[in-house]
Amino acid sequence: MSNPTYVQEYNAIVDVLSQYNEGGAKADSTLMKPAFNEQATLFGVDGDKLVGGAIQNLYDVIDNSFRPSPEARAAIVRIDIVGTAASARVDTDNVSGFRFTDFFNLLKVDGQWTIVSKIYH
Protein backbone atom coordinates (compact mmCIF):
# COMPACT_ATOMS: atom_id res chain seq x y z
CA MET A 1 0.00 0.00 0.00
CA SER A 2 1.78 3.13 -1.18
CA ASN A 3 -1.01 5.65 -0.68
CA PRO A 4 -2.11 6.47 2.87
CA THR A 5 -5.68 5.58 3.74
CA TYR A 6 -8.25 8.06 4.99
CA VAL A 7 -7.86 6.60 8.49
CA GLN A 8 -4.09 7.12 8.38
CA GLU A 9 -4.53 10.73 7.24
CA TYR A 10 -7.21 11.34 9.87
CA ASN A 11 -4.99 9.96 12.64
CA ALA A 12 -2.02 12.03 11.44
CA ILE A 13 -4.19 15.17 11.71
CA VAL A 14 -5.38 14.14 15.17
CA ASP A 15 -1.70 13.90 16.19
CA VAL A 16 -1.08 17.47 14.95
CA LEU A 17 -4.14 18.82 16.77
CA SER A 18 -3.08 16.97 19.92
CA GLN A 19 0.23 18.88 19.89
CA TYR A 20 -1.73 22.13 19.84
CA ASN A 21 -4.00 20.97 22.68
CA GLU A 22 -1.09 19.81 24.82
CA GLY A 23 0.75 23.12 24.43
CA GLY A 24 -2.35 25.06 25.47
CA ALA A 25 -3.09 22.85 28.46
CA LYS A 26 0.51 23.00 29.68
CA ALA A 27 0.92 26.72 28.85
CA ASP A 28 4.04 25.91 26.81
CA SER A 29 4.20 27.04 23.20
CA THR A 30 7.23 24.84 22.47
CA LEU A 31 4.89 21.84 22.67
CA MET A 32 2.53 23.25 20.02
CA LYS A 33 5.04 24.85 17.63
CA PRO A 34 5.63 21.61 15.68
CA ALA A 35 1.91 21.60 14.77
CA PHE A 36 2.12 24.95 12.96
CA ASN A 37 3.75 25.98 9.72
CA GLU A 38 6.20 28.82 10.29
CA GLN A 39 4.03 31.03 8.04
CA ALA A 40 0.79 30.20 9.88
CA THR A 41 -1.66 32.89 10.95
CA LEU A 42 -4.36 33.23 13.57
CA PHE A 43 -7.33 35.56 13.77
CA GLY A 44 -10.26 36.23 16.05
CA VAL A 45 -12.59 39.05 17.06
CA ASP A 46 -12.10 41.06 20.26
CA GLY A 47 -15.11 43.27 20.84
CA ASP A 48 -15.92 44.19 17.26
CA LYS A 49 -12.31 44.34 16.07
CA LEU A 50 -10.33 41.81 14.07
CA VAL A 51 -7.22 40.74 15.97
CA GLY A 52 -4.40 38.39 15.11
CA GLY A 53 -1.69 38.01 12.54
CA ALA A 54 1.45 35.91 12.67
CA ILE A 55 1.34 32.71 14.71
CA GLN A 56 4.00 34.14 17.04
CA ASN A 57 1.15 36.14 18.60
CA LEU A 58 -0.38 32.86 19.81
CA TYR A 59 2.93 31.64 21.22
CA ASP A 60 3.37 34.90 23.14
CA VAL A 61 -0.10 34.62 24.70
CA ILE A 62 0.39 30.96 25.62
CA ASP A 63 3.76 31.62 27.26
CA ASN A 64 2.95 34.91 28.99
CA SER A 65 -0.77 34.87 29.83
CA PHE A 66 -1.79 31.22 30.20
CA ARG A 67 -1.20 28.93 33.17
CA PRO A 68 -0.91 25.14 33.20
CA SER A 69 -4.43 23.70 33.15
CA PRO A 70 -4.47 19.97 33.94
CA GLU A 71 -8.27 20.17 34.05
CA ALA A 72 -8.43 21.27 30.38
CA ARG A 73 -10.47 19.06 28.04
CA ALA A 74 -10.59 19.17 24.27
CA ALA A 75 -12.81 17.49 21.71
CA ILE A 76 -12.08 17.23 18.02
CA VAL A 77 -15.55 17.93 16.69
CA ARG A 78 -14.85 17.54 12.99
CA ILE A 79 -12.09 16.83 10.50
CA ASP A 80 -12.64 17.15 6.75
CA ILE A 81 -9.92 15.94 4.39
CA VAL A 82 -9.66 16.41 0.62
CA GLY A 83 -6.32 15.40 -0.85
CA THR A 84 -3.62 17.57 0.71
CA ALA A 85 -6.06 20.00 2.36
CA ALA A 86 -8.00 19.60 5.58
CA SER A 87 -10.06 21.60 8.05
CA ALA A 88 -10.82 20.84 11.66
CA ARG A 89 -12.88 22.16 14.55
CA VAL A 90 -11.67 21.73 18.13
CA ASP A 91 -13.71 22.73 21.20
CA THR A 92 -11.73 23.21 24.40
CA ASP A 93 -12.89 23.80 27.97
CA ASN A 94 -10.92 25.10 30.95
CA VAL A 95 -7.68 26.26 29.34
CA SER A 96 -6.61 28.92 31.83
CA GLY A 97 -10.29 29.25 32.71
CA PHE A 98 -11.39 29.90 29.11
CA ARG A 99 -13.58 28.01 26.65
CA PHE A 100 -12.50 28.11 23.01
CA THR A 101 -13.76 26.96 19.66
CA ASP A 102 -10.92 26.81 17.15
CA PHE A 103 -11.14 26.29 13.41
CA PHE A 104 -7.95 25.08 11.73
CA ASN A 105 -6.89 24.82 8.11
CA LEU A 106 -4.16 22.30 7.46
CA LEU A 107 -2.08 21.37 4.42
CA LYS A 108 0.03 18.29 3.82
CA VAL A 109 3.47 19.69 2.98
CA ASP A 110 6.43 17.40 2.28
CA GLY A 111 4.37 14.46 3.53
CA GLN A 112 3.45 16.07 6.87
CA TRP A 113 0.21 17.73 7.99
CA THR A 114 0.75 21.27 9.26
CA ILE A 115 -1.61 23.98 10.50
CA VAL A 116 -1.50 27.01 8.22
CA SER A 117 -4.29 29.03 9.80
CA LYS A 118 -6.37 29.20 12.95
CA ILE A 119 -9.46 31.27 13.70
CA TYR A 120 -11.04 31.19 17.11
CA HIS A 121 -14.06 32.16 19.16
Range-by-range predicted roles:
Residues 36, 92-94, 119-120:
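Short beta-strand segments enriched in hydrophobic/aromatic residues
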Residues 1-22, 26, 30, 34-38:
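Short, low-complexity N-terminal intrinsically disordered segments enriched in polar/charged residues
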Residues 9-12, 41-99:
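Surface-exposed, charged secondary-structure patches
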Residues 99-121:
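Short beta-strand edge/turn micro-motifs at domain boundaries
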Residues 30, 82, 104-107:
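Intrinsic disorder/low-complexity detector
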